[in-house]
Amino acid sequence: MKSTLRISLKAGERIFINGAVLRVDRKVALEFLNDVTFLLENHVLQPEGATTPLRQLYFIAQMILINPEGKDHSTAMFRKSITMLLSCFKNEEILAELKRIDALVSTGRAFDALKAIRGLYAIEDNILNNHEMPPTMVEQIRREIAPWR
């Protein structure tokens, strides 16, 4: 890390740091002086929120960050999922971004991958609402990724 990173948290807010979950009891500012892997609570997707193919991919990618002991399993599941999604989506913007997301995870930048996945949610919602991806395919993806839960 070339410079320090400062994060402000409100009372009761949680942050996931290197696999640990911290909750603060008052407004605090944290200053990270070295490299750290973290996720703010408002960016953590709960399993029940992983209801679409990209949200499932997001959930898996976040597990790479917040569960260091299971990183190898999470990464293997991510690889399987990204391969499946690349064969299922037809939208060029999503396909290009999925390839970039795969490269981000491959180079240890899962945090950046999460941000990129969130950026695709609106396009995915449009695709699913307009049935551009058959419901049977969405269900197949869900079943393939469901063992993760």
Curated annotation (Swiss-Prot):
This protein's UniProt keywords: Bacterial flagellum biogenesis, Repressor, RNA-binding
GO terms assigned for molecular function: mRNA 5'-UTR binding
Keyword Mitochondrion included in the entry's annotation: no
Transmembrane portions of the chain: none
Domain of life: Bacteria
GO biological process: bacterial-type flagellum organization; mRNA catabolic process; negative regulation of bacterial-type flagellum assembly
Function: Has a post-transcriptional repressor function in flagellum biogenesis. Associates with the 5'-UTR of fljK mRNA and promotes its degradation.
Family according to the record: Belongs to the FlbT family.
The protein, known as: Probable flagellum biosynthesis repressor protein FlbT
Organism taxonomic ancestry: Bacteria, Pseudomonadati, Pseudomonadota, Alphaproteobacteria, Hyphomicrobiales
